[in-house]
Each structure stands twice: as C-alpha cells, then as structure tokens.
C-alpha cells in the first residue's frame, strides 16, 4: 500500500501534509515514534503500511507485525527458551510497526513484552503503532496498568500522534454495493 493509493477524498479530515512529512523518513533518522489513533476502518493500517513501504524504498529496515503476531512470537519463543532471539528481531529494525494495538485484551505477560520492546527502542529506533482504542483503555487491554503507563510514558515522549477520524472504508464498499443493488437504474446500466 502507498500514500498515492490512499483515498484522501473519502475522509477529507485526514491531512496529507503530516503524512507526507513522515514519508520523508526524518522521524526514523531522529528515532521518533508515531501513533495513529482512530475508529476501525479509517485507514490507519493503510497509512502505516504506506509509510513502512516508503521507508523501505528509502533504505530503512522495517518490521511490520500486528500486536497479536508480536505476542504470539514471544509466547512461542518463550516456550522454546528463545526469547532473546525474538527480542533482537524487534530491536534491530530502523522502524517497527505494531498494528491493531488494543483490538482486544492481550494475554498475560504481553505488557512485559511490549514494554521491553518500547523501553529498548526508546530514543534509539522508531516505533509506529495503530490503535482504535483511547490511551486510557490501554492499561485494561494490556492487563497491567503500571506496564501500560511505562509504555505510554516512553512511547509518547517523542511521538507524533495523529488522529485518523472519519467513516469506515470497509463499510463504504458495502454501502456502495447495497446502493447499487437498490437502484434499478444502476442495475440496468450494469446489465447492458
């Protein structure tokens, strides 16, 4: 996905300038973080992937994982006593993108894994996250309020927080299909 592929007209409240500024990669060179906050379906993941894609084109090493993949990686390697290897995988890239933070409550110890990554990357390497949950919910979702507080304290210190609000892109295609099916003229034009 790219910034050029993004439908800017669908949610005009999403400003292009800050996103194209991020696409320069300066935030990565300066070891700053980025957080996309907003309702589901508004394009947060698309924008994060587009910025990751641009970073790769600019020569940066990028790792993209959902929060569920991250937790699964650590739980799997913890069972195999290989946690340091997994941690190194998350510390090495210039940019780590963690998608869907807060989609649902995470398993026990997830806060420890996320804290370790954020703490070790803090002011050294960039991290980008997407979330559809307000920050005050993170303690409950992580299951560890002190860990969530420490994560947010470090992560937000040098982070650019972008509110991505508007209508759901996913529901747009559904409503377009329903409108087309309900409109007999549209159906007759399509049938010709």
Question: Model features per residue range: what roles?
Answer:
Residues 5, 34, 137-139:
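Short hinge/gating elements
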Residues 45, 94-96, 126:
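Conserved active-site beta-strand-loop modules that form the wall/rim of enzyme catalytic pockets
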Residues 14-92, 141, 191:
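Conserved P-loop
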Residues 1-17:
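Charged, amphipathic alpha-helical linker segments immediately N-terminal to NTP-binding catalytic cores
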